[in-house]
Amino acid sequence: MQKPEQVLRQWMLAVGEGSVEALMALYDSRAVLIPTFSNRLLNKNESIREYFEKLCSRDELSIALHEKTLSVIPLSKQIYSMHGIYCWRFAIDGELLSFEARFSYVVDLSLPAPILQHHSSQIPRML
């Protein structure tokens, strides 16, 4: 049986490869994505695909997990919540920029496309 952490690693690998198809294969048809770089809630596969098509077109796109921040919470036998912090990197106008973001997922490992909910937001500056 797959572990929830493996879903996250598959997702990160797909981001690093810029593979929209591999990303979409992880999102259930009912999935909701609250993305890092959008002010919209995406609850249709078409809008999730459009978001990742735009994001994956970025030069030097990568993502790195801050391993010590990852927490996995079992909600039932097959359903898990995960949260933590990762760092997006990509180039804008030739300059490589980094964006720290907090994330949460709800995954159902009994489904072929296990991601049901994914929220990611840039970490704001402290007041």
Where do the PLM segments sit?
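A short hydrophobic beta-strand element
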Residues: Q78-W88
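Short, aromatic-enriched amphipathic alpha-helices that serve as compact interaction elements
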Residues: M1-G18, L26
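A solvent-exposed, acidic/Ser-Thr-rich amphipathic alpha-helical stretch
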Residues: Q2, V20-P74
